Regions:
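Short, histidine-centered active-site or binding-site loop motifs used for metal coordination
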Residues: 101, 142, 181, 223-225
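Short, active-site-adjacent cap segments at secondary-structure transitions
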Residues: 74-75, 182-184, 226, 300
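Helix-rich catalytic cores of soluble enzyme domains
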Residues: 121-207
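Catalytic core of soluble alpha/beta enzymes
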Residues: 183-254
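Residues that line or immediately flank small-molecule/substrate-binding pockets and catalytic motifs
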Residues: 71, 140, 221
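Alpha/beta catalytic barrel-like cores
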Residues: 1-131, 144, 232, 236, ...
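Hydrophobic residues within beta-strands of alpha/beta enzymes
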Residues: 67, 136, 175-176, 217, ...
Length: 341
């Protein structure tokens, strides 16, 4: 099979119907903040134990096609010495590596950030391929305010995403391109739709300019929501309509799949919105792309609450993960029942 065919096949596998992707790629800094919120010390061993809890969850593979890992996690191992990547591969779960090196302020553009990490990326991708990674993720972040995002900020990050995607495909790795339009802010739903459409149009323009094979790409997107500080929160049906319109106006049909980040919504709200999107899909007789979830906080928040850093809570924490995954798998089919919460 040619490289292109393999990439296309892997991209399709990642968006297998009714399954999602677990985003467990918190940087040590973010993971430490999450530990501290539980009253736990920000220690490497606790971070390892937490990832072990997630990846050893029985039945994980029934609901996820892949797990996104941070560099420190793909190099880490379970108690018995099994590398985390091997543990996932043995379950039929694809290790996905986060390859961006986070954001830095965009010089001369107040209030905006750009994502870094292109230097040495081709070599790093080769190394990750050898460790078993078959997909990679890169996140760009856009803030909505009266004056942002600027055209320059959108262009810079989309050019970077396209370069990263081209390097991934060259290395036999499926790029998961994640332009996150932040939920935080006091913008309306209409403004969120306008910005997300602008960002996605620029992103696909840049991917095409760079001759990236769109059939071998996964889009990781925000849902289109009014800002967290906006006077009224958007109903699930309105989120679904706005999100669909945005994608129809920006995402080429060749793209095999779009997966959602949860973006700071409560786990329940993220699931409810996913369900409304799937219901709309059924009403419309299907979308050109497969849709799925790729939540981090939206899946892990209840797990962390149940765990509390205690070994005796591992079983309860794993049960909380399976429950959240089941609910999202149902939502992906438009059959989520809030009374099951
Ligand atoms: C886990 O968060 C990921 C990485 O964040 P940091 O580098 O800031 O720690 C992030 O890219 C995540 O994969 C997506 O944003 C989805 O997470 P949410 O919580 O929005 O579902």
């Amino acid at each position: 099979m040619s490289n292109t065919e393999q990439l296309r096949e892997m991209a399709k596998t990642l968006v297998t119907p009714h399954k999602g992707i677990l985003a467990a790629d918190q940087s040590p800094r973010t993971m430490n903040k999450q530990l501290e919120a539980l009253g736990l010390p920000p220690e490497a061993e606790l971070r390892r134990k937490y990832r072990q809890l997630l990846f050893t969850t029985e039945g994980l593979q029934e609901y996820v096609t892949g797990v996104i890992l941070h560099d420190g996690t793909i190099r880490n191992h379970a108690d018995d010495g099994t590398e985390f990547s091997d543990l996932l591969i043995a379950k039929g779960v694809v290790p996905i590596i986060k390859v961006d090196k986070s954001t830095v302020p965009h010089t001369n553009f107040e209030g905006e950030v750009v994502t870094q990490g292109l230097d040495g990326l081709a070599d790093r991708l080769q190394e990750y391929y050898d460790m078993g990674a078959r997909a990679a993720k890169w996140r760009a972040v856009f803030t909505i305010s009266e004056n942002t995002p600027t055209e320059q900020n959108i262009l810079f990050d989309c050019m970077t995403l396209a370069r990263y995607a081209a390097l991934c495909q060259e290395a036999g790795i499926v790029p998961m391109v994640e332009p996150e339009v932040l939920f935080s802010g006091s913008h309306s739903l209409e403004r969120a739709e306008e910005v997300t459409t602008m960002v996605l149009q620029k992103l696909f323009e840049q991917l095409q300019w760079n001759n990236v094979d769109l059939e071998g790409v996964i889009l990781k997107s925000s849902m289109v929501l009014a800002g967290s500080e906006w006077s009224e929160q958007t109903s699930a049906a309105d989120v679904a309509q706005a999100t669909l319109r945005t994608f129809m106006n920006s995402v080429p049909p060749e793209v095999p799949g779009i997966v959602f980040l949860s973006g700071g919504q409560t786990p329940q709200r993220a699931t409810e919105n996913l369900d409304a999107i799937a219901e709309l899909e059924a009403q419309e007789g299907g979308f050109p792309w497969e849709l799925a979830f790729s939540f981090s906080r939206g899946l892990e928040q209840p797990v962390q609450e149940a765990w509390q850093g205690k070994d005796e809570n591992i079983e309860a924490a794993q049960a909380a993960l399976i429950k959240r995954l089941q609910l999202n798998s149902m939502a992906d089919q438009g059959t989520y029942d809030p009374s099951m919460e």
